[in-house]
Amino acid sequence: MLIYNTLTRRLQEFNEMHRGRVNLFVCGPTVQDHFHIGHARTYIFFDAVAKFLKLEGYSVFYLQNITDIDDKIINRAKEMGIEPSEVAKIYFSEFQEDMKRLKVDSVNFFARATLYIDEIVSQISRMMEKGYAYETDDGVYFEVRKFKDYGELSNQSLDQIIAGYRVAVNENKRNPEDFVLWKKKKAGEPSWPSPWGEGRPGWHIEDTAITETYFGDEYDIHGGGSDLIFPHHEAEIAQMRSISGKRYLAHYWIHTGMININKEKMSKSLKNFITIRDILKDYRPEDLRFAILNANYRTQIEFSKELMEESKKLIDYINDTYRKLEYVNGSGNFKIDVNSVISEMRSLAENDFDFHSVIVKLLAITGEINRNFEGINKEVAEELKKVYLWVDTFLGILEQKKEVSKGIVDDLVELRTRMRKEKNFLISDAIRDVLKKNGIHIEDRGDVTVWWQE
């Protein structure tokens, strides 16, 4: 299996650290507002990654942090007139609900930052002991110039990074590029005890404290949006490697591209900010999963109504065809080598999680099924369903429908056929309309009528 590694900027063969086991960490959200389709892109993609790795036979532990204290949460609490912890509780619950609706259910554990203060303090203390961190009047900072590989992930030299920080925004810091590890307490803000006085953690430190707790000082895969490469992920590497002295924090770094809305960057200031809840008012979870997974994960997605409408149409096409296979009554000898098809799809997905090519292959098979439908018998139909179910294991694009009573529908279809033969079109049309209202699609093929659930 090949993975594009942001750290090395090339495709690399995937070799797990521990045979058959993969430790995967993806940066979770800051729980202070409604979640948008940019979040959806990252979490849907890594949900598919985790599920595909499991399908490949790996035992996957998928860990995600939850930032439940930071400046944004504190400011949001002031706006809402409640405690920061309440803000975090409200929006973490909303996040879980959104993910459930999107079929993102592969995360093994959500680690809330405020439950790891002791681990955070331990890491900062070790950085100070090794000379990488220092205390000031307002907090504790990491001295970037001490870590010579800083900038490797984002493909910048340390000199370039230093040159980019020309103005010191905090006179307490030794150098403008240094980042905060611990913020000393301010009036009215939540705080926890530490050797440097009451305070709270900086943003970057929570992730390495959490991953060290569960994975140790290095692990297999770290994921997140490409907007986190610098400075967030760069800082994570500096923190953990300054303590461990090892070459890697994560062996593979995977980053998803950003989303543009109507060819403009999605942002609140441009008022083109789309929440997950808003998009799900007009489209199904499967439509959004399809739109996201049908794009190369490293590219930008040009998000638009046209994209969603096309995704909706193709999801209908895939699901209608899959459901038709439930009710096939052909007697022909049409065949497809299902094992070969699945093997080809597996190879496509193994090439840097190329889910787009998997979807292209699925659509090609779907077209072939529809062109040869009358030549498909029940045994072949059962085999063909395996292709859709295999793909759905990680892409999650088959729509869940309430089952209808096959016996009742068969009786109604038989009655309608009899009424048509007797030219009693009033009743036959009425039966058709009743079936349609209940999501049953019927198709007359000469003297034979086939039906499937839409």
Curated annotation (Swiss-Prot):
Localization, UniProt: Cytoplasm
Cofactor: how bound: Binds 1 zinc ion per subunit.
Catalytic reaction(s) noted: tRNA(Cys) + L-cysteine + ATP = L-cysteinyl-tRNA(Cys) + AMP + diphosphate
GO cellular component annotations of the record: cytoplasm
SUPFAM superfamilies: Anticodon-binding domain of a subclass of class I aminoacyl-tRNA synthetases, Nucleotidylyl transferase
Keywords: Aminoacyl-tRNA synthetase, ATP-binding, Cytoplasm, Ligase, Metal-binding, Nucleotide-binding, Protein biosynthesis, Zinc
Annotated GO MF terms: ATP binding; cysteine-tRNA ligase activity; metal ion binding
Family the UniProt entry places it in: Belongs to the class-I aminoacyl-tRNA synthetase family.
Protein name (record): Cysteine--tRNA ligase
